[in-house]
């Protein structure tokens, strides 16, 4: 067996296993519960060389396969840990791995993952001052180095900085989540605070190279070019279209203020410093292996897209690719194919593009589904929605079917009148301008706090739809700063344009199809084919997606004949 990885189901461990397997190595993965195999399969990794073994590093180890390289990526990371809980993994566990590695006759290297703020310290760490996590990591680092010298174990310590990438929802991710939700009123630290990053892909490639390098090294693996924290947060804010805090609070003041006021856990504050780190040896090893770090700004933007898509660990993206793009001045959240979609799907209120997930799964060909400007995850624009739509479709090289829902139907009609050559057909699902107006309460300012406080269950009940991931996604957006207010404004704006939209509908020159639910029927006569789905309400694509897809397909076949 080439290598064994402890902590193989963790964020670093699982990616390291994937990297080693991709390199053709035979890998033993030490797990308590095997969630690793399914994750590797989801990443398309060939697991023929993988052996999963059960083990608990908090206990003395035995019965594990003989290997050449040992990686300990296991750690108990959390703030507010008890001392014994933290030491069990970060000190005792680290020593148990080392003691077992020392018995291996063919051991080439023990690679111990420490931390950029905890390595190369002396003395006994102060648990009361540092907190259990950081203190236990410091103690474990010192203990592993000392015991390795005693047992003459070939050891390399790798000290990564803040590791970012898909699936990372702790550490810096919590700061980004506060920024995204509008809770980050001021930046912690000062103008020179340095919180370096490294991507998970780069880190595991680096780790895979370590056993062939000389033993006894300490490698600080981080991007020296990471922007200082204020600039870093500003870059993420610009990318995601949210305001960046203009004020900062010095760490010294944060330590003195009550946690209820600052929202900052005391243990997080020691990571906010202006320190720099000795990266020369790590950069030399990377250069010899041909490894290059991706630009920090690009890595942060890609990670921010991943965080928003996954709702910071609370959900799973329903389609890829996804991310923020500038459309008519709006940082717009876009899901799907931007260049050759067969269908372009525009959501209605109060939903976002996730509304279309059940229908999209039943449609042939690629789709493009954005969040409308100012709604869902998209930032606002000063342009009319139809102008924004024209810019959204400017890279599109096909003539897709434009499918709009509810209040998006008005802008879709205006776009179809102005740009008939850009689309092949217009489908209006529950067009609000042809239906009864929304209740007065939904248009009032009283609706704003109600929407912000609504649980997903209450929202689903109000809309008459199942409480699925689509509704949970919408409820999460409505809690963000400004979204509920913009939804209420959009309801009023849409109502004011009903007469204009009805008049423009007769000027659309491409084929038009209308789909409504029987409990939310049309209240105005139309000269276009209209389909009524029995038992459906205002959101037939959620409650009856198969029937909506069937009607869309039937119309396409008819047009193609």
Cite the ranges covered by each PLM segment.
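N-terminal Rossmann NAD(P)H-binding glycine-rich loop of SDR-like oxidoreductase domains
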Residues: 3-23
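NAD(P)H-binding glycine-rich loop region in Rossmannoid oxidoreductase-like domains
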Residues: 50-92
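Conserved Rossmann-fold NAD(P)-dependent oxidoreductase catalytic core, especially the SDR/UDP-sugar
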Residues: 72-73, 92-132
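NAD(P)-dependent short-chain dehydrogenase/reductase
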Residues: 148-195
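Terminal hydrophobic/aromatic helix or amphipathic segment near a protein terminus
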Residues: 229-274, 293-296, 451
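Amphipathic terminal alpha-helices
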Residues: 279-330, 555-557, 561
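Active-site loop/oxyanion-hole signature of alpha/beta-hydrolase fold enzymes
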Residues: 369-403
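Short beta-strand/loop motif that positions the catalytic acidic residue
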Residues: 508, 514-516
């Amino acid at each position: 067996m080439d290598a064994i990885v402890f902590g193989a189901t963790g964020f670093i461990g699982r990616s390291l296993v994937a990297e080693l397997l991709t390199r053709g190595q035979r890998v033993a993965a030490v797990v308590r519960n095997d969630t690793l195999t399914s994750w590797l399969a989801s990443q398309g990794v060939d697991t023929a060389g993988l052996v999963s073994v059960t083990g608990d590093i908090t206990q003395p180890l035995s019965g594990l396969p003989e290997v050449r390289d040992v990686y300990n990526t296991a750690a108990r990371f959390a703030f507010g840990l008890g001392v014994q809980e933290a030491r069990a993994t970060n000190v005792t566990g680290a020593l148990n791995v080392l003691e077992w590695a020392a018995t291996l006759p063919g051991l080439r290297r023990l690679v111990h993952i420490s931390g950029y703020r905890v390595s190369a310290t002396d003395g006994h760490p102060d648990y009361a001052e540092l907190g259990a996590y950081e203190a236990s990591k410091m103690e474990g680092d010192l203990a592993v180095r000392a015991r390795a010298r005693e047992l003459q174990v070939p050891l390399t310590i790798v000290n990564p900085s803040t590791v970012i990438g898909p699936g990372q929802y702790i550490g810096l991710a919590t700061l980004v989540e506060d920024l995204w939700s509008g809770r980050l009123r001021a930046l912690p630290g000062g103008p020179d605070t340095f919180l370096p990053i490294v991507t998970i892909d780069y880190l595991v490639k680096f780790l895979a190279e370590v056993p062939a390098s000389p033993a006894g090294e300490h490698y600080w693996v981080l991007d020296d070019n990471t922007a200082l924290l204020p600039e870093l947060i500003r870059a993420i804010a610009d990318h995601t279209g949210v305001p960046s805090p203009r004020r900062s609070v010095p760490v010294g003041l944060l330590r003195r203020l009550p946690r209820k006021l600052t929202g900052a856990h005391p243990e997080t504050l020691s990571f906010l410093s202006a320190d720099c780190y000795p990266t020369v040896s790590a950069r030399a090893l990377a250069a010899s292996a041909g490894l290059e770090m991706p630009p920090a700004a690009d890595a942060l933007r890609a990670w921010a897209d991943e965080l928003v898509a996954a709702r910071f660990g609370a959900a799973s993206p329903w389609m890829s690719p996804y991310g923020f793009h500038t459309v008519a001045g709006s940082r717009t959240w876009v899901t799907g194919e931007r260049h050759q979609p067969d269908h372009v799907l525009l959501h209605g209120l109060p939903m976002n593009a996730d509304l279309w997930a059940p229908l999209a799964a039943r449609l042939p060909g690629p789709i493009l589904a954005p969040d409308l400007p100012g709604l869902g995850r998209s930032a606002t624009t000063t342009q009319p929605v139809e102008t924004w739509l024209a810019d959204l479709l400017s890279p599109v090289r096909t003539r897709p079917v434009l499918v709009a829902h509810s209040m998006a139907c008005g802008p879709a009609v205006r776009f179809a009148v102005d740009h008939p050559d850009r689309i092949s057909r217009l489908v209006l699902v529950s067009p609000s301008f042809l239906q009864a107006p929304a209740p007065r309460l939904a248009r009032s300012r009283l609706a704003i706090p109600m929407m912000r406080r609504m649980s997903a269950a209450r929202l689903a009940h109000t809309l008459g739809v199942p409480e699925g991931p689509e509704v949970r996604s919408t409820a999460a957006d409505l809690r963000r700063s400004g979204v509920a207010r913009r939804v209420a404004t959009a309801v009023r704006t849409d109502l004011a344009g009903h007469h204009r939209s009805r008049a423009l509908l007769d000027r659309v020159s491409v084929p038009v199809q209308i789909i409504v639910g029987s409990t939310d029927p049309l209240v105005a006569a139309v000269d276009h084919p209209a389909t009524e789905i029995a038992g459906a309400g205002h959101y037939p694509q959620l409650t009856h997606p198969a029937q909506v897809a069937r009607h869309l397909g039937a119309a396409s076949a008819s047009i193609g004949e």
